[in-house]
Regions:
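Bacterial N-terminal signal peptides
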Residues: 7-16
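Sequence signature of WD/YWTD-type beta-propeller architectures
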Residues: 20-278
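Bacterial N-terminal signal peptides that target proteins for export
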Residues: 1-7
Length: 278
């Protein structure tokens, strides 16, 4: 019995679409590593394949804390290029680097037209087109760090020194009174899930997630060592983080389900930190 031509055509289309889906699911993780001596930006597929170096300047400058732009065409990062720590932007392939401003720990807004950053222990937003800046954290709050845009672009999560330790807060992007989310175990480095329903953060030793209203706090990494700098996957189902035997490292990247589970090693060799996932 011959297979009808229409069924053959439909089967071919289905296989083609499956192949496209498999290719598109191969997401990438951008991170900073000292495996080439100075800290440089590197890229690896989320399955651990195709590791490659992105920034390759022949200097002792340090490139850290990278973040993909929302459209994936540019990268925001902190660098000591030009002799002073600042926020830089470049094309995804490492070309066309440009210094944007003083500061560090910069993060794109969801629409890609603004950034949030830290400068002199304050949290600011900056318009990329005109350079207009606005201080978001209260002027009398010391030691603010780690700004992170909410997916709807209306709020920023950040950490601040609070009483005997750190605490995580959320503040409207336009300014206002910050609302405390969590203030125990040195909580810092907050980052939102893609749907805005969870925030991942780090304590002195582990990675946790929590609702933005401070409820349903959950420890994700129960194992030994120290875990830092966690970020959600684009679909919100996984987390990438760096793991070290101690605060001195060396650090390696791991991936774990966002609800906890068995971690999978992603990189090894040198120290790998500050991952961002697209």
């Amino acid at each position: 019995m011959k297979t009808p031509k229409l069924l053959l055509l439909l089967s071919f289309v289905a296989l083609h679409l499956d192949a496209q889906a498999a290719a598109s699911s191969l997401s990438q993780i951008l991170f900073s590593s000292n495996r080439s001596s100075a800290w440089r930006l590197w890229l690896v597929n989320a399955d651990g394949t195709e590791l490659k170096q992105v920034t390759k300047q022949d200097t002792d400058d340090q490139d850290v804390d990278p973040m993909f732009s929302p459209d994936g065409k540019s990268v925001l990062f902190t660098s000591t290029r030009a002799g002073k720590t600042g926020v830089w932007r470049m094309s995804f392939d490492g070309s066309k680097p440009e210094r944007l401003c003083d500061g560090d720990q910069a993060e794109w807004s969801p629409e890609g037209k603004r950034i949030a950053l830290r400068r002199n222990e304050r949290i600011l937003t900056r318009d990329l087109a005109g350079g207009t800046e606005k201080t978001v954290s209260p002027e009398d709050w010391p030691h603010c760090s780690g700004p992170a845009w909410s997916p709807d672009g209306k709020s920023l999560a950040f950490a601040a020194r609070w009483e005997s330790g750190n605490a995580i807060f959320i503040v409207p992007v336009g300014g206002g009174k910050p609302v405390k989310v969590y203030d125990k175990q040195g909580a810092c480095e907050p980052h939102w899930s893609p749907d805005g329903t969870r925030i991942v953060y780090e304590t002195e030793t582990h990675i946790c997630t929590i609702n933005p209203d401070g409820t349903k706090n959950r420890v994700i990494t129960y194992f030994g060592g120290v875990q830092r700098y966690a970020r959600f996957s684009p679909d919100g189902k996984s987390l990438v983080f760096c793991q070290g035997a101690s605060e001195q490292g060396p650090w390696e990247l791991y991936v774990i389900p966002a609800t906890g589970g068995t971690p999978r090693k992603l990189t090894e060799g040198g120290s790998d930190m500050y991952p961002d996932w697209r």
